[in-house]
Structure formats: C-alpha cells, structure tokens
Amino acid sequence: MTVAAASTRPQRARGRGHLAARALDGRTRLAELFQEGSAKIRLPATFDNSMEAVIINTAGGLTGGDRMDWSIVAGPGTRIDVTTQACEKIYKASASTAEVVTSIRAGAGARVDWLPQETILFDRASLSRRLDVDLDETAEFLAVEAILLGRKAMGEAMRQGLFRDRWRIRRAGRLIHAEELRLDGDVAALTAEHAVLSGQVAFTTLLYAGPLAETYLAQVRPLVEGHMGGASQWRDKLVVRLAASDGFALRKILIPVISALRNGAPVPKVWNL
C-alpha cells in the first residue's frame, strides 16, 4: 500500500484589502470595503471631512513567499489618510521573496496621504515592493516610506538580503515620477558606501505631487537643514530624502516634515502608540 507523504510546504501569509471612498454632504464616506486573508482595514472615527484608514497585516510580519495586496480608491473631492497599525516587519526568508503591492487611485480634487509606519528589514530578509499611483489632473498625493535595516537598539542589523522598491506615479495617464531601489546581497557593505547611506541604517523618501510643492519646499528645507538628506521641487512635485543613525533619530526629523506637508496636521494617532 502506498501512503501519500504529508506536505511539508510551509504556510504562507496571503492578504488582499480594498477601500474606496466617495464624497457625500461635504464628508468623505465609505463606498467599498473588501478584506481577505491576513489583510484587515480599520476606519477610526474622524471629525472633519477626511477619512483615516489603518491597514493591518494580522500575520504579524512577512517572510519569503508571503504576499499582501492593497487597493485604495479616492473618489472625486475625497480625502483619505492611509497608515499602518504598526511597523511592518520583514523576517529572514528561507526561500523565495515576500511581495507587497499597493495600488492607489485619486479622482478630481481628491487627496491621498500614504503614511505607513516604518518597514523593518531583518538580516536575510527578502522583500519586493511596488507602489502604483494614478492621479487625476487635479488630485494631490503624499507618500512616505521609511526603512530600518534592523533594530539598532536591539543589536540587530540587516547584513545580507534583498530589498526591491518600485514606485510609478502617473497623473492623467502620464508618468510623472519613478523610483527604483535595489539592495541585494551584501547589504551592510553596500549601504556603508558614501554614495549610498554612508553607514546609516534608517532612511526615508517622501513625495508630494500637487500644486503646493513650491510652498511646501520653503517650509521643509529649514527642517532638514543640518541632517543627512535634502529636498527638491520641480513641476508640481516635491521629493525629500533623509537618512539617520537609527529609527528614533529618523522619526525626530521625519514627523515635523510630514506635518509640514500636511498643512500642519499631525501624523495619524497610531504613530504615537
């Protein structure tokens, strides 16, 4: 008699979350909500015309072979702030690569602020991430992505591994911004180079696309002066890049910059928990 061997294939986390909003009576209201697998979306109460969405990976982190898909649709005249419940942790991958794909669409006069908390990459983590954004001609968009190469306070560092990050931002179908980052192999040696991170282990990119780019530049430059980084503005677009010695030092610079790019509004409350 032949007995089938039990599968030893490890379980993989899968999640898919979709949120769509519409404007109604001057407020941003929920139009569609879908969540599947490890993806959850929570909507804390707000007291203005915006909506706050907190996306959650109930798996508690990602490793090789896991995949999360997020979709955000902001209808005309809406405002959505999207953040994460906690820092996303990317653990050592025994095989394959974790994937995170985020799609954002903003209609006429809408604004979307994509404000996830930091992503922490542990040693031998493997992550491929993609952000695709489609903006109406009159929409505004703010994106913040911060990366920690390990947890310095815990004596942890990402020495080997893979991190790929791809952004494609389009306005009315035209490509207006592209990012392509790849850290592969000996990450510690690569990031030690002066032309890369000069040994810093925490870094971030902020992008604002909209009519206030020039105004924001004047507010942001004094905040980043004296730190490792800089800010540039052109064609209704502002890009800020920062690096710091650890996550705490990065946050001290990052949070005031985010607030400036949000007309003085604070970061989402979950950032303070």
Swiss-Prot record:
Single GO cellular component term: cytoplasm
Cited Pfam families: UreD
Name listed for the protein in its UniProt record: Urease accessory protein UreD
Location in or out of the cell: Cytoplasm
Annotated family: Belongs to the UreD family.
Keywords: Chaperone, Cytoplasm, Nickel insertion
Assembly and oligomerization: UreD, UreF and UreG form a complex that acts as a GTP-hydrolysis-dependent molecular chaperone, activating the urease apoprotein by helping to assemble the nickel containing metallocenter of UreC. The UreE protein probably delivers the nickel.
Gene name of this polypeptide: ureD
Known role: Required for maturation of urease via the functional incorporation of the urease nickel metallocenter.
Domain of life: Bacteria
